[in-house]
Amino acid sequence: MTKTNKIIGIDLGTTNSCVAVMEGGEAKVIPNAEGGRTTPSVVSFKGDEIMVGEIAKRQVITNPNTISSIKRHMGEANYTVNVGGKKYTPQEISAMILANLKKTAEDYLGAQVSEAVITVPAYFNDAQRQATKDAGKIAGLNVKRIINEPTAAALSYGVDKGDKEQTILVFDLGGGTFDVSILTLVDGTFEVLSTSGDNALGGDDFDLRIVDFLVQEFKKENSVDLSKDKMAMQRLKDAAEKAKKELSGVTSSQISLPFLTMSEAGPLHLEYNMTRAKFNELTKDLIDRCLAPVKRALGDAKLDIEKIDQVLLVGGSTRIPAVQDLVKNELKKTPNKSINPDEVVGIGAAIQGGILSGDVKDILTLLDVTPLSLGIETLGNVFTKLIERNSTIPTSEKQVFSTAADNLPAVDIHVLQGERPLAADNKTLGRFQLTDRPPHRAEFLKLKITFDLDANGIVSVKAKDLGTNKEQKITISGSGALKEEEIQRMIREAEENAEVDRVKKESIDARNEAENMIFHTKKSLEDLKADVTPEEKDKVETQIKELEEALKGDDTALIKEKTASLTKESQGIAMKAYQKAQEKQAQEKGTQENTTAKNEKPQDEVVDADFEEKK
């Protein structure tokens, strides 16, 4: 089979997946072998046979070796599923789905496919994105780009809408997750302003409400618990999903399941006329749950509802009339439904693939954002942010730090993700060390920390000793998995604990400043003992003792007061230290000039020199 240079687009969904490709200047969804334009994200094992898609979905309840919704566990370092004594990671199960989609594309194109763009939820963190790339690699795909699902959706709409300036809200209610993103389209550039969502809300939950209701009704009428009958539950689940879909177009759906189970008296049948009103009643709380992420996304973007120009519906569950009514009533906009919501993300991924391969010339730029802040732990358990939450990616930030103590042989770099001021309250992404360092005084050691966040949302952290130019680097992967619930919990806790955190951080900063002042003052007293009068020394040492005593307590105001007193009292000593340093520098310069004159080199010979990088 010949190899194609086309880059396919894949929407790897929790419940269903979709593959598309650019052909003749437009994105086309590729039907699978059964003719379906989407493929269930389900894998089933039967002996040595591995089944993917619709055939696997039909065995979800009856075959215990059937895996569904594996996407919920992407990025979880220790999560595996056990099938016949063999353990599979989420990446391996996802790779089986991706391999199936890859084959679908190859059968359609008649050529070997090796490159893809894969979409992920906007809230996916570094570990989850890396796991998705790994799954692609296992499936034999070089993942050229990971893009956010709402961005892909906006891209698919945006190709037809031109570059008119607008603010877009993407309402993505899929089979297993719910995401809200707000984007702007200006001069052909999409920029994500904010993202929010609920990782435990989707079409599956709506199906389950119908199933649970029918189980209860059947038990009332027949005194038989269907939940203990796997075959009956499989039929119920299929019937519930069918009824839900029908109720999007009609006001009632007849659920008819003859010979559903057996009793002592003989076979039992289920007949129920599910109305849209009853369905709305059963799922009202699920509809209401859609509101909070919408409000949070608007708040994060600092926008009023009136500023939203367009609402895009993504995900099959947005066909539910009550969902569309919620959007109309709360956002005061008639949602855009011009593209099939099951296919819109896959189409956007294919367009991005076309941009990368050169098939699409009218390029729309994508500017995604990172869902949480990134940084490191600094003295006193403080979380120092280098990349702020909702920063546009790709991005790179660097900052120079000094160490807290002299002669450290190694420096531990603790990489974190979150929104709280204290390191312990945030999520650890990884740790690494800068080792084998020569003895240095703390004030002379400078470390440059660089964070690089690539277009896929994957972070690399580099530490460089500016004295020795020694570097150490880490690319964060699997161990730092965050679920959407964790992200939303972190954001919520950051808001709820803002004042408590401010007080804690103020206390830590005051202590750090005090300890730093004591250290440098004692050092100056030692270095300048020949130049400091006994009276000056006594006054400064008294202030040091008072500050050290204050540090034993928790009175931040007192610590600040005593630090200020010590600073004022030691100003004379500090001035002497500065003058002495200036004199020493002048002497060294004179000696150097004298040596240079004696050993003058030809003009064209290179001479090493120190330099200071200006920022």
UniProtKB/Swiss-Prot annotation:
Residue numbers of Phosphothreonine PTMs: 177
Composition bias, Basic and acidic residues: 581-591
Gene3D superfamilies in the record: 1.20.1270.10, 3.30.420.40, Actin, Chain A, domain 4, Substrate Binding Domain Of DNAk, Chain A, domain 1
Keyword Phosphoprotein: yes
Primary role: Acts as a chaperone.
Family from the record: Belongs to the heat shock protein 70 family.
Family matches, as HAMAP family: DnaK
Protein name per the record: Chaperone protein DnaK
Native organism: Onion yellows phytoplasma (strain OY-M)
